[in-house]
Swiss-Prot record:
Belongs to the truncated hemoglobin family. Group II subfamily. The keyword Transferase does not apply. One of its GO terms (molecular function) is metal ion binding. PROSITE patterns: GLOBIN_FAM_2. Its cofactor is heme. Hemoglobin-like protein that exhibits a low peroxidase activity. Its very high oxygen affinity may rule out the possibility that it is involved in oxygen transport. Keywords: Heme, Iron, Metal-binding, Transport. InterPro entries: GlbO/GLB3-like, Globin-like_sf, Globin/Proto, Globin_bac-like_CS, Hemoglobin_trunc. It comes from Bacillus subtilis (strain 168). Heme binds at residues 45, 48, 63, 76. Binds 1 heme group per subunit. This is Group 2 truncated hemoglobin YjbI. Disulfide bonds: none annotated.
Amino acid sequence: MGQSFNAPYEAIGEELLSQLVDTFYERVASHPLLKPIFPSDLTETARKQKQFLTQYLGGPPLYTEEHGHPMLRARHLPFPITNERADAWLSCMKDAMDHVGLEGEIREFLFGRLELTARHMVNQTEAEDRSS
């Protein structure tokens, strides 16, 4: 892929990124597989996700400045994340991208990075999750 943008954050922009995260968490809040592993109030979760994605996409290091190194896998280990939940998470993100009109190379780039990250967070099989 011939990226036609410098920092992905610049291509998306703060406003669209904020809309994407808010729309994403609206979907997460009502998803039967995801709702049980997220807090009922997603305000702080969305705020941290905005900070993280800003930094992850080449913007200011907002997440690290407030929370330290992201250590994503370690921070997600307490939650039962299965391949099925990773798929659900990615589906919510695709829906959010559709809703806010994120398209083209930047969408492909971001979704590709998020897909790798979601797969890396998987820490249980579906069988282990059902037996918990």
